[in-house]
From Swiss-Prot:
GO molecular function: 4 iron, 4 sulfur cluster binding; metal ion binding
Name of this protein: Tetrathionate reductase subunit B
Binding-site positions, [4Fe-4S] cluster 1: 59, 62, 65, 184
Domain (4Fe-4S ferredoxin-type): residue spans on this chain: 50-79, 97-128, 129-158
Superkingdom: Bacteria
Gene that encodes the chain: ttrB
Binding site for [4Fe-4S] cluster 3: 106, 109, 114, 148
Transmembrane helix among keywords: no
Post-translational events: Predicted to be exported by the Tat system. The position of the signal peptide cleavage has not been experimentally proven.
Length: 250
């Protein structure tokens, strides 16, 4: 568990600068507080663009994706990179309440709002579109957490750094599926390279192009987690009253 004793000097230096900025925010632009060098980002290949399609018609809310993700990525208790939320939606002019399942995770946007707000360039987008966090640079300021419109980030209290779904990039690079995709009982989650027209995800996105939806399209983030069978109440804006996930005690 992170204790703060071995924090490297560059992080200490930045936190000292951040304290100065906080005291005189109107005088010094945040962008001036940086690590002494800018990192080179070469991870991934521009020949690929990874995305996920979630077929809600096949999701049963079993939370196997949540459990397998937690095991694979060793997230702290009570913190999740992905989960399936249950919502209650009431139609306008109707007394009927419908229960709706909605898997949530980082949307790996083309225009990720979490990236430009990071003062130390710890959050960045790979050339294949996957958004990741460099834990060696992250100082846990939580600016990216606040900037994410999908509530997909959190501060890992063990590492004291930002945490989120990475599409299990370590598994993708080994030729494996993300833990959530591999464990999905209903086969609701599909991941692949949308630049490959023969990939399963590209084929399905084309076949169902009139039914594919994303969350909060009005934000202009160009999310790359696509939904098939998404209730209109969750498109613009995300509405409905969130209920405890099915696996939680209520």
């Amino acid at each position: 568990m992170w204790t703060g004793v071995n924090m490297d000097s560059s992080k200490r230096q930045f936190l000292q600068q951040l304290g100065v900025l906080t005291a005189g925010a109107s005088l010094v632009p945040l962008a001036e507080a940086k690590f002494p060098f800018s990192p080179e980002r070469h991870e991934g290949s521009p020949r690929h663009r990874y995305a996920m399609l979630i077929d809600l018609r096949r999701c049963i809310g079993c939370q196997s994706c949540t459990v397998s993700c937690t095991i694979e990525n060793q997230t702290p208790q009570g913190a999740f990179r992905t989960t399936v939320n249950q919502y209650q939606v009431q139609r306008e002019g109707s007394q009927e309440v419908t229960n709706v399942l909605l898997p949530r995770l980082c949307n790996h946007c083309d225009n990720p709002p979490c990236v430009p707000v990071c003062p130390v360039q710890a959050t960045f987008q790979r050339e294949d579109g996957i958004v990741v966090v460099d834990n060696k640079r992250c100082v846990g300021c939580a600016y990216c957490v606040q900037a994410c419109p999908y509530d997909a980030r959190f501060i890992n209290h063990e590492t004291q750094t930002a945490d989120k779904c990475t599409f299990c990039v370590h598994r993708l690079e080994a030729g494996l599926l993300p833990a959530c995709v591999e464990s999905c009982v209903g086969g609701a989650r599909i991941i692949g390279d949308i630049k490959d027209p023969h990939s399963r995800i590209a084929t399905m996105l084309h076949q169902h192009r009139d039914a594919i939806k994303v969350l909060k399209p009005e934000n202009g983030t160009s999310p790359h987690v696509f939904y098939l069978g998404l209730d209109d109440a969750f498109v613009t804006p995300l509405m409905g009253r969130a209920q405890p996930a099915l696996w939680q005690e209520v």
